[in-house]
């Protein structure tokens, strides 16, 4: 029988529910158990694909092409499993599917209601997540905060799950806050008590409380929380701020979180061997060097807009014993006059993905600087397209070279709309999304990054592509097209082999990076940047 673990949050948002879910997933996986994780987001958007990065942060893409919440990136990095479309579900998705079934007559004329139809669809998504990925344990994070009107259908659905599959197959974990009042020099448990009372009022009694704190909670405080919230004192687990999120599984294991969960389920499993993970975390906290990487982007005011890029860079720093000092540079503020001042101290330059024409000229200036000054450079998605435009302008001499996304009337369409996108008018879920094969050129930097494999699989999110009319001309000037689709039609990777490192990919390599297994392009880019550090 599949076991279900539900993670809710109270008091305030951003308590780290996703990291708690991911950490528990890691602990259970290291016990030899099959685990998957999913998140329910209570907003009306069908998916986050069309949402403003400043509001939502990064859009994470799964193998099957689903545009998801950034928490799925954390899930994949922690449990090292690739997730799918059942791993992120929104209110909008649930309602759209229910309404579609109603239009098809599937409900046989019944009055369609939140209960049972919406809650039934939610439960179906929960169960299907485990079935499609062959998981024995499904960890489900409920987005938002208990008490929010938007979350009520999800909370009602997970309440019903206990009756449907049995108490012995369901665990409720509630994350909450124990704030420290500096003026009074005192920690307060009342917000946690009220949050649990709110959860209990809708029929959910948490089995475990994970309390976010600035300082350790005392035994007396633990007993007080347990008494008022009707849980065992051992099930009050503290989650303090830590230097790296990857240490949280170790902190939770020390407090027996995974064992408490398994005891409730009556499941016997070997203790999680976290030796390799602990060694990795120890290494992360004792890095001897610092590498300065300039990220030139459009959404730099919000770090979460590039969270997977930032994580992939940190992962790539570990093999060279280096911490990454990531300098977020607003592309709009880069000009020919100040580029040296802005980027002169960087050991490497990265231009990540994005959409629209804002900041494009600054990105072109930054890439020109990297190419001419031989600063290690990595371009991703839009970064690859802009690198192609820069080469056309400054090497081929086509001053007005551009992408038709930025300038439909350009006479040199270096980047153009993909043929199968010409008749697409919907914005959401219509790009080239998900895992696609990429053929690598033998002897190239790209091939070396992937251990000289001939074919790799990478995740994409774009609707524009390189215009093959310019391929021969650029090749003659030294640009190498080192990665293409298997039929050689779509350009996937470009590089300048004579440079220390100048590689750009149409796909998103950051989505497949892991803390214990850095992604190849990021690894080699950071290694090249490490050789630029002035010790």
Curated annotation (Swiss-Prot):
EC number: 6.3.4.2
Biological process per Gene Ontology, one example term: pyrimidine nucleobase biosynthetic process
UniProt pathway annotation: Pyrimidine metabolism; CTP biosynthesis via de novo pathway; CTP from UDP: step 2/2
The keyword Ligase belongs to this UniProt entry's keyword annotation: yes
Binding sites annotated in the UniProt record for UTP: 13, 188-193, 224
Catalytic activity: UTP + L-glutamine + ATP + H2O = CTP + L-glutamate + ADP + phosphate + 2 H(+); L-glutamine + H2O = L-glutamate + NH4(+); UTP + NH4(+) + ATP = CTP + ADP + phosphate + 2 H(+)
A Pfam cross-reference name: GATase
CDD domains: CTPS_N (cd03113), GATase1_CTP_Synthase (cd01746)
Keywords: ATP-binding, Glutamine amidotransferase, Ligase, Magnesium, Metal-binding, Nucleotide-binding, Pyrimidine biosynthesis
Listed NCBIfam families: PRK05380.1, PyrG
Other notes: CTPSs have evolved a hybrid strategy for distinguishing between UTP and CTP. The overlapping regions of the product feedback inhibitory and substrate sites recognize a common feature in both compounds, the triphosphate moiety. To differentiate isosteric substrate and product pyrimidine rings, an additional pocket far from the expected kinase/ligase catalytic site, specifically recognizes the cytosine and ribose portions of the product inhibitor.
Protein name: CTP synthase
Lineage: Bacteria, Bacillati, Bacillota, Bacilli, Lactobacillales
Gene: pyrG
